[in-house]
Amino acid sequence: MGSAGPVPSRPASGDQERNVRLGLRANLGQFSILVLLNAFVGAMVGLERTVLPLVGTQQFGLASTTAVLSFIASFGLSKALINLAAGAVADRVGRRRVLMVGWLLGIPVPVLILVAPSWGWVVAANVLLGANQALCWSMTVNMKIDMVGPARRGLALGLNESAGYAAVGLATLAAAAAAAAYGLRSGPFGLGIGIPIVGLALTVLLVRDTSGHVAAETEQLGGPQSPPPPRSGLGNILAFVSWRDRDLFACSQAGLVNNLNDGMAWGLLPIFLSRAGLTLGAIALITAAYPLSWGVLQLGTGSLSDRLGRKPLIVAGMALQGVALLAMVKVQGEGLWLATAIALGLGTALVYPTLLAAVSDLAHPSWRASAVGVYRMWRDLGYVVGALAAGLIADVAGIPAAITAVALVTLASALLTLLRLRETLPTHSGSASSASF
């Protein structure tokens, strides 16, 4: 599967190296802190998901859907490019340092949106938000992967993504309530000023680096899991993950399409529901139900992939996303739209942690963070593609046409994944036996 690594992590030293154990139970304290931190990371995005498209249309008077969705494109492009570098940098300098930088970049975001005199400021703030999400979310993912080892990788990623996206949903509801009480910007983003500050403080005071865990897993593997990428360096890993390896290619395209439809949902659903005559409270409930169900259900789907395998969940989840989006434009009424949002969340819950686990299965520990960074780059470029394509289609043919087009692309991706991806779950006789729960 994976290979001997071109980008070694910093070695652990002294007592840390001797005391390191892989497994969820052995690292429960640090793991729990990182789960909490990822909830703070998710809350940063949740502040925007209902209110920011409405800020664009109602406060800044943007008539073009493409212009409204430009904040998602800037977020996605920043997040994608920094994801690519974040993994490689983390393999060299350690995860904790990168996590701290991510929180520092998040501190100006709510302030810039609060005081923005033009939409350009909001777009610029989302460049910083993309960097914050890339660095912080990537590092919480990689540190959990490092700690638990292969045997509970799906469970670990399910817990991580569950915390993050449940927080997205809860923050979406809180932001809508604050917007109704104090204004579209003053309420949500005044509330959000403290989030990155608390996240940074918790990281500095409580988080330890996981270099020793990477070294321990590499030692337990006793060598490469599969033939190495032919040359060392980030450029080679980029090519290997993007197209040279058929399984990693399948994961990368599925990740891109997943976030393509998420970017569309983030930008278009609030406007679609607003034009249908729903109140801000009803819009918030439906738009929050999607990430909230996505987050909560990942508690089970990540662990399920450890037992059933990665491929069935990924293919089924992509197909369910496509069907849910098609249904969304066909039904009418708050209750039915809520049901389709929950179905979309279930589909995403099946896909999201499982794709990360599959990429982690395929990558050797010594270059795993770089491989995950490349995958996350492609996944988050989906925000750019989704925002721009959906915005252009909506401007030309209407929002229902844009949602339908994204649904069809998602179904095509499910078929491609079915045909290209092989099962990646390690066997109990291989690396999966090296860690204990």
Predicted regions and their residues:
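Juxtamembrane intracellular "pre-TM" segments in multi-pass secondary transporters
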Residues: 3-28, 209-251, 434-437
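Helix-loop boundary and gating motifs at the non-cytosolic
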Residues: 25-76, 247-250, 254, 258-276
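Interfacial helix-cap and linker-helix signal at transmembrane-aqueous boundaries
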Residues: 56, 89-90, 177-182, 273-274, ...
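Residue-level signature of mid-helix packing/kink "hotspots" within the transmembrane helices
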Residues: 76-84, 169, 291-299, 383-384
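Helix-to-loop junctions at the C-terminal end of transmembrane segments
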Residues: 82-94, 297-309, 394
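Structural signature of the two symmetry-related core transmembrane helices
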Residues: 97-111, 312-327
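Cytoplasmic helix-loop-helix junction between adjacent transmembrane helices
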Residues: 125-166, 357-358
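C-terminal membrane-cytosol helix-exit motif in multi-pass small-molecule transporters
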Residues: 194-219, 413-422
